[in-house]
Amino acid sequence: MHLNQLVISHLACERGENRLFEGCHFSVSSGEWVQIEGHNGIGKTSLLRILAGLALPVAGEVLWNNLSIHKQRDEYYAELFYLGHYAGIKPELSAWENLRFYQKMQGLSLDDEALWFALDKVSLVERADLPCSYLSAGQQRRVALAKLWLTQQKLWILDEPFTAIDNHGVGDLIMHIERHCSLGGMAIFTSHQTVESNKVRTLSLDQFKL
């Protein structure tokens, strides 16, 4: 099994003229998952966007297998699943059609059983045929979350993945992340909830606040 590593090297992040954090450094290797903690406004979402290559730090760099993510964008994005605050789905398509489109875009097997299983895990089977524009914001986010049961990407970066699901769904997702990491995957996430798992490592951004 090929081992991957994401290294966060002395990152600094600003919002406007306000420096949120600096000197942020840690690493995540295959088999590990890390919860990013910190008080509101410290820059947790900003950090995840930097790790996903969607924003630039004012200092420092992010390395994937010893090379800057910006020097190997195609290779990095091929291994990255990012869930931000926006669902990133097509509102004119149904939940089922969105997941089928995702399977095609990722070159996955067009497996109906896997697709229905993913919808079941986020409690959307009964709404699978509705255009996503008819779904609530929380339900649309669950459509995006269902992709986690389809993706083969190794690195998951998830911003508040538990907000749109009930307690049973939270338990299912935690077990799914644990299984993903046990098979050589890795995950970095934020959450206001306490994650009941002895396998998760926590990192507080507060320690990097000026």
Swiss-Prot record:
It is an enzyme of class 7 (translocase). The keyword Cell membrane applies. InterPro entries: ABC_transporter-like_ATP-bd, ABC_transporter-like_CS, ABC_transptr_haem_export_CcmA, P-loop_NTPase. It is a peripheral membrane protein. GO terms for molecular function: ABC-type heme transporter activity; ATP binding; ATP hydrolysis activity. It is found in: Cell inner membrane. GO terms for biological process: cytochrome complex assembly. Its EC number is 7.6.2.5. It catalyses: heme b(in) + ATP + H2O = heme b(out) + ADP + phosphate + H(+). Residues 1-208 form the ABC transporter domain. ATP binds at residues 38-45. Belongs to the ABC transporter superfamily. CcmA exporter (TC 3.A.1.107) family. Part of the ABC transporter complex CcmAB involved in the biogenesis of c-type cytochromes; once thought to export heme, this seems not to be the case, but its exact role is uncertain. Responsible for energy coupling to the transport system. This is Cytochrome c biogenesis ATP-binding export protein CcmA.
